[in-house]
Design a protein with these regions (language model features):
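A conserved short beta-strand
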Residues: 125-137
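Serine-hydrolase catalytic machinery in alpha/beta-hydrolase-like enzymes
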Residues: 1-100
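C-terminal catalytic histidine-bearing segment of alpha/beta-hydrolase fold enzymes
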Residues: 169-228
Length: 228
């Protein structure tokens, strides 16, 4: 059983997919539950929001890894979080019956970083898509994103030009790197700072719906006896 605490928002009826939302630094598992209702208002998805494993000193919030400098997570705490999330994701797939290819990983700030990590680690199953608000692809010793084998993973990136915590150049670099590797990327910039811009939510929700539908069609095409 996973050591991570988490919250769940069940789908209405049998889930058509799984959405795992990872919060940012200084927050907890409650933070993105409201985002789930906006992204998936018809409750087609089973939603899970994990709590990061590390407590912040003198703060009620949590974080995923230590930060020597932006863009370069501490390798030990980063690796520990990656393995703990892997255990949770595996547990969720088994319990819900939803497969990785029907799963979307999303998050804000550090949570976006962890979504990239879990989607692009070579030893992990590839999800249907990644929803990254104000994040980056981490540079960490002994970890490299496996992009060559993930070209079917769809990516939505939204970042504020006025972000003073994680500069927009990180998002631009991620989009460029992913596109050059052949991944389909939908990229949005706004005048926002370091937060999820509400103006980007309609596009993110539409992307989520489209990604879910594409994953359904792909699964149908791969199933035995599928028609033309």
């Amino acid at each position: 059983m996973s050591a991570l605490t988490y919250r769940e928002r069940p789908a209405d009826g049998a889930p058509e997919g799984l959405l795992i939302l990872h919060h940012g630094r200084g927050s907890d598992e409650h933070d993105l539950l409201t985002l789930a209702d906006v992204l998936d208002p018809t409750h087609r998805l089973h939603v899970v929001t994990p709590r990061a494993p590390l407590e912040l000193p003198d703060s009620p919030g949590y974080h995923w890894y230590l930060v020597p400098r932006v863009g370069y997570p501490d390798p030990d705490s980063f690796d520990a979080a990656r393995h703990q999330l892997g255990e949770l994701h595996d547990e969720l797939w088994q319990r819900t019956g939803v497969k990785p290819e029907r799963t979307m990983l999303g998050g804000f700030s550090m949570g976006a970083v962890m979504s990239y990590v879990m989607a692009f680690s070579a030893e992990r199953p590839a999800p249907a898509g990644v929803l990254a608000f104000s994040g980056f692809i981490a540079s960490v010793e002994q970890w490299q994103p496996d992009l060559a084998n993930r070209t079917a993973v769809r990516v939505f990136i939204a970042h504020g030009k006025r972000d003073q915590v994680i500069g927009v150049e990180f998002a631009r670099a991620a989009a460029k790197r992913l596109r050059e590797a052949g991944l389909p990327v939908e990229y949005h910039e706004s005048e926002a700072g370091h937060h999820i811009d509400p103006r980007e939510i309609p596009a993110a929700s539409a992307w989520l719906t489209d990604t879910l539908e594409r994953s359904r069609l792909t699964a149908r095409a791969k199933s035995p006896g599928a028609g033309p």
